[in-house]
Amino acid sequence: MPESNTISRLTGLRILAVDDEPDILETIVDVLDGTTVDCAKSYEEALAKLDSKAQAGGTRAHYDLAVLDIMGVDGMVLLQQTVGRGIPTVMLTAHALNPQSLKASIVDGALSYLPKEELANLAEHIDDVIEAIEKNQSPWKRVFSRLGKAFDQTFGSGWELEDPDFWSKYKSPSYGVFYHRPPSKN
């Protein structure tokens, strides 16, 4: 996909990024140029941002997307908060990269999962998620298409055989169609 389309799809989005590592947050801000990224270094700080009142109208803060670390910030608990508020969520991980955390992310409603080693590709990855949402398609099909070989290398060949029915449906182009509100650029 041409870079200009990626930039235009992301431009103006408000994103909540949560990670306990300041350098990761700095990278997220740099990679997501053209967006407004609110950073939080802890679960409590993220929850406060989610609950904060918007300046105009007194409504809750609105985010178009959340990018959450799984480990250091209670990311799986925070995932339930963002999904419960209709915020599309991408999970990041370095240390928790295993089939169990991937499955838990899917079950709890994350729309994508990205190893931190792929952080430089975050904008393209989010663009894929947004495009899938716009086309009422499963973002997970794209995740597995993009990262399936990396998962195989990390988890070992045949890792999906422990639960083949579960994994086959998330690789299907029709499964997991997005039912929350799509990101807006307002």
Where do the model's predicted regions map?
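Alpha4 helix (beta4-alpha4-beta5 surface) of REC/receiver domains from two-component response regulators
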Residues: 77, 84, 96-128
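Conserved acidic segment of CheY-like receiver
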Residues: 6-23, 27-29, 66
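Acidic, metal-coordinating helix/loop segments flanking the phosphotransfer/catalytic sites
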Residues: 22, 39-65
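A short, hydrophobic beta-strand element within the central beta-sheet of small alpha/beta folds
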Residues: 66, 71, 79-100
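C-terminal output/effector regions of signal-responsive regulators
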Residues: 131-186
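Short alpha-helical interaction/output segments
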Residues: 46, 75-78
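Alpha-helical interaction/dimerization surfaces of two-component signaling modules
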Residues: 27-32, 104
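Conserved phosphotransfer cores of two-component systems
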Residues: 53, 60-61, 81-88, 108
